[in-house]
Amino acid sequence: MNPTPLRDYQRTVHFADTDAAGVVYFANLLRFCHEAYEDALAQLGVDLRQFFSNSGLIVPITEAQIRFLKPLYCGDRLRVTIDPQRLDTSRFQLTYTLYNEGGDRVAIAQTQHMCLQLPHRQRVPIPDPLPAWLKSAPEEASDRED
């Protein structure tokens, strides 16, 4: 099944996003990725307040990485694309590509997420409507207990 197409997330880099060197502080690029994730969930029709309220189901990020390619500065326009992929029945990975206004890639990031049921933090299947958005992982992926 093809993933549901969503619009790219866009934002302007603010002064508060930068560090003393005048470039975006490294951790803020991961924040921008999470903003793009939240925007994608909203586009899918997910009630964000309920999704992030820990009301029985939690979807923590279990792994994050980012590679910086070019700096971003205050006032730059940023575009974030997301490539979603199912890893197994309860885990998925999002690959983010961040672009500046000129279309240059400035960073590539990945986050892995796991769906857990409270209070015992048992793994559960990825909830609707996310499965339709996620691409299937290659056959090597399995339901492992990472």
From Swiss-Prot:
Gene3D superfamilies: Hotdog Thioesterase
Catalytic machinery residues: D19
Catalytic activity: 1,4-dihydroxy-2-naphthoyl-CoA + H2O = 1,4-dihydroxy-2-naphthoate + CoA + H(+)
MF annotations from Gene Ontology: 1,4-dihydroxy-2-naphthoyl-CoA thioesterase activity; fatty acyl-CoA hydrolase activity
Similarity annotation: Belongs to the 4-hydroxybenzoyl-CoA thioesterase family. DHNA-CoA hydrolase subfamily.
Function: Catalyzes the hydrolysis of 1,4-dihydroxy-2-naphthoyl-CoA (DHNA-CoA) to 1,4-dihydroxy-2-naphthoate (DHNA), a reaction involved in phylloquinone (vitamin K1) biosynthesis.
Protein name: 1,4-dihydroxy-2-naphthoyl-CoA hydrolase
Organism: Thermosynechococcus vestitus (strain NIES-2133 / IAM M-273 / BP-1)
